[in-house]
Amino acid sequence: MAKTNSKNLLGQKIIKLLRNRDFVISVFVTLFLILLFRVISVIPLPGITISQNKNNLNNGVSDFFDLFNLLGGGGLSQLSLFAVGISPYISAQIIMQLLSTDLIPPLSKLAKSGELGRRRIELITRFVTLPFAVVQAFAIIALINNQRNGAIRFENGGILHQAFYIVTMTAGTYIGIFIGDIISKKGVGNGITLLILSGILARLPDGFIVMYRVLGGVIISTNPILTSAINFSLYFLAFLVLLLAISFVNSSTRRIPIQQTGEGMVLGNEKLPYLPIKLNAAGVIPVIFASSIMSIPITIAEFQPQSEARWFVEDYLSLRTPVGISLYVILIIIFTFFYSYIQINPEQLAENFNKSHKFIPGVRPGLDTEKHITKVLMRINFIGAPFLAIVAVIPYIISLVLNVPTTLSLGGTGIIIMVSASMELYRSLRSAATTTSYQRLRKDIANRIEAELSLNDYMNKPNLEHDQYGLLGQHKKVEPTQDKKKNPSDPLEVSQLW
């Protein structure tokens, strides 16, 4: 009975949402722009030939660009207008967020100056995006020229044509940012996040197909179809377990109770307002940092195919070697501690608590509060940082052990982004539904009050002919009667008879 009632309530909410014109338009705008982004992402630029063999294409691009293809929306794999994608904008956002702390006082002042300061920082971020986009587009062109398997080639490799590709890819970055802004303002959810999520979801079917074909050759058997089915079933089960584990970690928080000065201990700690600190407070940013640092020597070595440095990098710094994977894990753990501290900012929290007359029960305001929050954050990171590192290196470990291609969309990094984006989209839809319900309720109440007032005005409408002083509006006034001199021949009034 309870399940039936809950289903009916859910159905009623969905029907109410679909009847709301503004909400339906927002969803339609979001879906249309995401579809437009995906269509442009699969159309190669003119003058570029791409091999039909996806494995050769993946081998022709380094792991660094595989990650940035994931972050950029998936346009790099087809060398489309969105080949660079929105990953330069994400890099610029991360750098501006780091510099907006106490590292650069003017930026820190802007970050603390309200909405106007945030708009200026956003404008600066757009300018910082430009060099990142140009450098990444140039690196893509250089790697295509130096690739060994010919998965991608230019029909005309002249300097002017390559400069045209760099300008076009850079322009595609800003077009992607523009589409994301429209989704954020006119649609549902965060536009940039949804574009990244669309790229990950678009790559999932191809990733599953590739893994199904590859896993069939891992174990030699008389029945390859059965072997492929069993191996892929185990792989898909592991994928679901990893998905559930990441969802659990992303939604796990450490709650620090907060109390207002002057209020007695009326409620217990479990009922007090609290400060939530996520188990994975840094998100996927440490993975991006570590990948960027690891990619620098790899990318430089790609430009010098015959040098000894290239073989050293491939033997020790590549993410396909145990040494490279170990170094990658260490960098992720270090950046997780570093970025989570910047993200939470215990010093700023302690200062805000002091200004708003709030405190943590049992902890003195000020420096002790800062130390307490830092201590809690460090304890959380001892769990969250290794978990994030293990999740990030899963595709590389699978590739190293089973000798299968690296598919980051099916790996930990792609799942982390997918889970975070899906949870953010769910919160946005729920917020939109709540806002829609309140707007409809307010509109109904306003219409009801207006109708009641109109009815009361009609029922209690005064006789304007008796409004001698014009207090009820402009109308014909009735002049007050003046005393006339009585004529002795006039008849007496009734009142005068008494």
UniProtKB/Swiss-Prot annotation:
A Pfam short name: SecY
Region (Disordered): 478-498
GO CC annotation, single: plasma membrane
Gene Ontology biological process terms, A to Z: intracellular protein transmembrane transport; protein targeting; protein transport by the Sec complex
InterPro entries, per the entry: SecY, SecY/SEC61-alpha, SecY_CS, SecY_dom_sf
Family listed: Belongs to the SecY/SEC61-alpha family.
Entry membrane topology: Multi-pass membrane protein
Stretches with biased composition (Basic and acidic residues): 478-488
Subunit: Component of the Sec protein translocase complex. Heterotrimer consisting of SecY, SecE and SecG subunits. The heterotrimers can form oligomers, although 1 heterotrimer is thought to be able to translocate proteins. Interacts with the ribosome. Interacts with SecDF, and other proteins may be involved. Interacts with SecA.
Gene: secY
Keyword set, alphabetical order: Cell membrane, Membrane, Protein transport, Translocation, Transmembrane, Transmembrane helix, Transport
Lineage of the organism: Bacteria, Bacillati, Mycoplasmatota, Mycoplasmoidales, Mycoplasmoidaceae
Places the protein is found: Cell membrane
Role description: The central subunit of the protein translocation channel SecYEG. Consists of two halves formed by TMs 1-5 and 6-10. These two domains form a lateral gate at the front which open onto the bilayer between TMs 2 and 7, and are clamped together by SecE at the back. The channel is closed by both a pore ring composed of hydrophobic SecY resides and a short helix (helix 2A) on the extracellular side of the membrane which forms a plug. The plug probably moves laterally to allow the channel to open. The ring and the pore may move independently.
Transmembrane segment boundaries: 23-43, 65-87, 124-144, 163-183, 191-211, 229-249, 281-301, 322-342, 382-402, 406-426
Keyword DNA-binding: no
Protein name: Protein translocase subunit SecY
